[in-house]
Amino acid sequence: MLLAIVVISAAVPSFGQSSPYPNERDVPKGWVTAPSSKANPSLWECAGYGGSQIVSLEEGSLRIGKPPDEEPEQVPLPQQLKLSKEMHGSRSLLRTADGWLVGFDAGEFGGGLWWFNNEGDENQKLLSENVHAIYHTRDGVFALVGLAHLSLNSGQIYQFTETAEEVRVTHLADLGGSPEASTVDSDGRFVVATPRSVVAVDYAGNLRELYRPGEDLTYPTSVVVDANGDIFAGMRFFVLRLVPGNSGDYRPQWLMEKECQSFKIVKRICTCGDKY
């Protein structure tokens, strides 16, 4: 399975726990359970000015880090692929049987999905939507597209197919929001964080909402699923953890850095601990 990709002071109470849930997990070292926005609105205001958290897996273990200071380099394209003016923004790239699939995401300025032949002298526009990710899974090739900007918040999954006669995409699922971060779990499901929810979609297009919070997700950056089946979504200031239960539902646990139990907004930056 290949991924082609190419974001005041207070005391802090905790969420209540739902039950029953097997195998209660420890909170990652240096992190604590965060309060709801209702319990501590000042913290959530500060979080809107906080730095982003990036989640990843290293040898199956969760790692939480900060994004690099420099902008990530663009995905390099084969030299023979010639881009038009409308092909701009961050890129996703996947080699196909007879060519290349290239996606673009320029936010509110547009995007799209194109197929190029091997020689690069022919291309076909397949979608006019912003492409967030292209996946090659055991069930085929899929593109996650969408946009969250001002009042807009939409997202879709399309399946790409390629034959000797044609290349095309077919609609698989409506995500209900822009796929800001995503991954594929061990069952082959897409696990997607939108600005307002976390959903899972199987290869047949069946969507299941895993979490729709009282809290909007604060600009999701990344999603991973660990060996226990716990889902982690990194975002601005927080990490959301979803712990699977016996009945197939998920218990949400909002996490934040321990030092952020004291915080202050300084020059429109959320500053934690003794840094202010």
Summary of predicted features, one role per range:
Residues 32-52, 82-95, 127-138, 175-184, ...:
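Repeated scaffold domains used in trafficking and secretory/extracellular systems
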Residues 14-18:
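Boundary at the C-terminal end of the N-terminal hydrophobic targeting segment
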Residues 63, 108-114, 150-158, 197-202, ...:
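Structural motif
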Residues 73-85, 120-126, 166-173, 207-213, ...:
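A short beta-strand motif characteristic of beta-propeller blades
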Residues 53-56, 63, 100-102, 141-143, ...:
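Conserved beta-propeller blade signature
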Residues 1-11:
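Bacterial N-terminal signal peptides
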Residues 50, 57-59, 96, 109, ...:
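Short loop/turn segments that connect beta-strands within the blades of beta-propeller domains
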Residues 116-120, 161-165, 202-206, 243-247:
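Short loop/turn segments that connect beta-strands within beta-propeller blades
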